[in-house]
Amino acid sequence: MKLWKVLLPLLVLGCSLYGLFLLVSGATLLQGLLCLWLFAEMIVNWNGMSYLTAIKDYRGILCSFLAAIALSFGLGYLLVFILGAPVLEGMLFSITMGYGLMMVWDVVLLYRYFPQSDDSPWTFLRWVDRFLPLAFTGLCTNLGLFSHLVLYWSGPIGVQVKGLFYGAPYYDVPALIAFLSILITSINFVVSVEVNFYPKYRDYYSLFNDGGVVGDIVTAEEEMLAVLNRELRFTALKQLFCTAGVISLAGTLLNLLPLGFNDLMHGYFRTLCVGYGLYAVGNTVLLILLYFTDYLGAVLAAAVFAASTTAFTLLSLLFNTAFYGFGFLAGAALFYLVALFRLDAFTANLPYRVLGQQPIVAETKEHLFTRLGIFLEKQDAKTARQTIRRENRSHE
């Protein structure tokens, strides 16, 4: 019940704004309803996966993804190829049902791991004020990751699909396939970097909390940073080899698929493979900055990524379409360098960062979101009292 109280504001606000867009977008009633349904499911799924990754239930997430993929493909094939349903509506309905299955699966897992609690469902708003830089880090990272796609929709290669729906198929398709080349880094961060680095990280910080001697702290720091440097170097090398392999082999494989790849799309693909590879390694460094609670450095790197990618993409619109994608490549390279230099500067004097930069007196931040949480808690308490009074009157 409390899960839905948290999701309710997101669903109401998000669906209201997206619903207004759909009303003027030119989509049919059925298409609009399916898009709105899918949008609402994605809100629940995104929040659910955030909690499930926090408790590291990767098997549950994998099973929900596999079940959703199987249902989407199976139902899509049945509706479109066997029953002859319209392709757009049939595939959109299939995807919606697949994500619906994922939503139900994730909610069941959430209720299994997080049973009913007496705590207020609005407590998380207090943490928003404390960790607001994380929200801006995520926002800037996503802006840098997707702004180049949106900007090219308005360029010479952009097409109007229908109403307010735009795209750039010659660029979007290579971008989607190139993005898959960074899966090795995403997986490597979980199974290698976190597995090998986190124990050293935990031992180092436990010495500060448990009264470790200076010699042990220095030794633990050297071991931790050595493991970190090794894992980051291996991550970069794995992504380099993966990117080189994909660029070398994908040209032949992509020509075998009915995707309509031409020389221009192959050029976009190669450029974006390098760009996404740099982004993947830079994002790994960004996550390590968050490990060390360097929220300022993380926001700085993410902001540079968002601003540079957008600016370089706008600049590339002035040149020939063959140069599209280099704006994202330049922004990703700058993001990687800024994040790496920040991590090097931060870890160069780590004991001072851990001890000297902490506030002497504990600070309690009560800003907008905290006050909003207190207000909602009071409203819940007021509603609960009114409910109890009504129940008492009915019993009398």
Go through each PLM region and give its residues.
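Short, highly charged, low-complexity non-transmembrane loops/tails of multi-pass membrane proteins
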Residues: 200-212, 350-389
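Short runs within selected transmembrane alpha-helices of multi-pass transporters and secretion channels
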Residues: 34-54, 91-104, 250, 267-292, ...
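Alpha-helical transmembrane segments of multi-pass membrane proteins
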Residues: 4-48, 240-248, 258-285
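Transmembrane helical elements of multi-pass membrane transporters/channels
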Residues: 94-194
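Membrane-water interface segments that mark the loop-to-transmembrane alpha-helix transition
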Residues: 1-19, 207-246
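Small-residue-rich segments of transmembrane alpha-helices in multi-pass membrane proteins
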Residues: 12, 63-77, 125-133, 303-310, ...
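Hydrophobic alpha-helical transmembrane segments
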Residues: 64-110, 322-345
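Helix-loop junctions and terminal segments of transmembrane helices
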Residues: 1, 184-215
